[in-house]
A protein has these predicted regions:
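Histone-fold recognition with a strong bias for associated Lys/Arg-rich disordered tails
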Residues: 1-174
């Protein structure tokens, strides 16, 4: 497979993930930080996460619950964890499979949902969201506009059928 180039959106997202890691006092950029950045992304990946009820404040609290708050005052050398590097690499594999022109945040979200062992995937599962639902919705968003319009009603029904809205769940105090 030909190596795909990271889109400007994905490069910016990785930088944003680094900012989140620094804000949380973490000395690494993990898949959880990539998921946080994806939740704020303006494209399809961010919309899919927000439609599932995963807003940035909710995800931030889940990351803090799992990894804790580090020191924000110390200079912390940062880099992608091996899992995060693998996720970016797998995003390239997804882009190649789909024969797209570059690696986008949507491809990264596809890759994260395929890796059951990564922290981002565990956060999704812990919040009551099936990674497969996120994968299906994201994959649908990557289809051509004609295909998307034809399948829009089906995909919305699938999301409603298999995914919980975390905002509604929180409002019910479950």
């Amino acid at each position: 497979m030909k190596k795909q180039e990271l889109s400007g959106r994905l490069r910016g997202l990785i930088v944003q993930a680094g900012r989140f890691a620094r804000e949380l006092g973490h000395s690494y950029v993990g898949t959880e930080h990539l998921l946080l950045a994806l939740s704020q992304e303006a494209g399809s990946a961010g919309r899919v996460l927000r439609a599932a009820g995963l807003e940035e404040p909710c995800l931030r609290s889940m990351v803090l619950a799992g990894a804790g708050l580090g020191s924000r005052t110390l200079f912390l050398p940062q880099g992608l964890t091996p899992r995060a590097r693998r996720a970016v690499h797998q995003a390239g594999v997804e882009a190649s499979r789909l024969k797209t022109g570059g690696v986008t945040p949507e491809h990264l979200l596809l890759a994260l949902t395929r890796d059951d062992g990564c922290t981002a995937c565990r956060i999704l599962k812990g919040s009551g969201i099936e990674p497969d639902c996120i994968f299906t919705e994201t994959f649908g968003a990557l289809r051509t506009p004609e295909q998307t319009q034809q399948g829009r009603q089906t995909s919305v029904r699938l999301l409603e059928q298999y995914c919980e809205n975390m905002i509604e769940k929180a409002a019910r105090m479950e």
